[in-house]
């Protein structure tokens, strides 16, 4: 019958809590929701793979024992940070955090499709079944293996189409049935994009990461999607905050990261020793006078 829909679909079925048990492993399998035919009818397909992106958010792991425990952030390629497309929905919206997202492919048909979210140009994909191991977080990232170009994570699909259930036998008589209608839907291949983190049983603001104290624009983007589908274009046109994205060059970070890390550690120490030496020399000269 048409209408407005938001789909937030996990292409992967995985127990995330298993990552933090003794083995530090979890198994990713295809998520079977019996929606493949429906999405194919609308001209999109959620692939049975998992995106790994060089431009990613960290995962925070505990290091040490008892009172000496420290929480250390490590880049986690399964947490892509997405820059929204410059559309009426994504305009003036900051970076969005995705978790365990799958690529979306489009299929040619008469419906209109507009790209809303996509990964960076430095990715690779994992086929299912896949083993997700936390040891990967502490291993050195090899940028040379991230050779695939960007993959779509969200599309707006709109148009007028026949129902997937056309010509099927109805379980009961329904006089108001319409087999063709106008519709708009947003499909997102990440069911975690609208998931709040929980702290002491209380849900935190959507987009806030309690482990890194970072704020992402998940909430603002989802609100924009809802306003767009509800026809509230005035709300979207009056937004005026500008975001300037400055992504790091991952290849340079991996090449020179160790040098700058040790420089930042040792340089203050060397400056401190030099300052003590100079002040000691000045003090000795003053005592001799």
Spans of features found by a protein language model:
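Short, aromatic-rich amphipathic segments at membrane interfaces
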Residues: 235-264
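Selective detector of the "anchor" transmembrane alpha-helix that sits immediately C-terminal
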Residues: 257-281
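Cytoplasmic C-terminal tails of single-pass
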Residues: 286-289
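Acidic, S/T/G-rich, low-cysteine, solvent-exposed domains in lumenal/extracellular/periplasmic regions
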Residues: 1-234
